[in-house]
Amino acid sequence: MRFTGLKYLQLLACLGLFACGSAERYDVVIVGGGASGTAAGLQAARMGARTLIVEEFDWLGGMLTSAGVSATDGNYRLRGGIWDEFRTELARHYGCDSALITGWVSNVMFEPSVGDSIFKRLVAREPNLTVWYRSAAETAERGKDVWRLGVRRDGRLRQVEAGVLVDATELGDVARIDRKSTRLNSSHP
């Protein structure tokens, strides 16, 4: 069979449609890798859900671990959960719980990079959890039983599907993208 220019272009177009048409499927997609988004991702993965965190930067923990706000109102009597794992890792890093009490503002203070590295270690331990750093959701559409997202990653728009979508961004980025499925204020019509 001889390929002419037009037939060759048609073949390439068909192959391109097949290559671009398949979406990556997750049970849960969390847009935003701040403290709440990372904690939600860890918990979903631990419950057996195939989970993706889409994070705009290469840093986890958001305002908890960056911008010089690494002083929490953490209570040492609050034992359990992801907060306790995080606090225990901080104490391990600095040598003991009392090493975290270094200021007037908080009972738990730490260097931002230490918080980021702890979250990254916790995430890396979870086989059901994937993090896409330097990525952003650009489109979001609610189907009958699935969310369809277009996520910009490595300069390419990737298609992702999930049964559950969590907007854990600082400013409600997904809510702004998907105005049909989301009410943007508390007023009622």
Which residue stretches match the model-derived regions?
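Conserved beta-strand-loop-beta-strand element in the redox core of flavoprotein oxidoreductases
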Residues: 141-159
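Single conserved hydrophobic/aromatic residue that forms the stacking wall/gate
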Residues: 180, 184-189
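Flavin (primarily FAD) binding-site architecture
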Residues: 167-179
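Beta1/beta-strand and adjacent pyrophosphate-binding region of the FAD-binding site
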Residues: 24-34
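Bacterial Sec-dependent signal peptides at the C-terminal "C-region" and cleavage site
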Residues: 13-25
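N-terminal Rossmann-fold NAD(P) dinucleotide-binding loop
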Residues: 37
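Conserved N-terminal/central alpha/beta ligand/cofactor-binding core
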Residues: 43, 49-50, 55-139, 143, ...
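Core beta-strand elements of the Rossmann-like FAD/NAD(P) dinucleotide-binding domain
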Residues: 26, 155-164
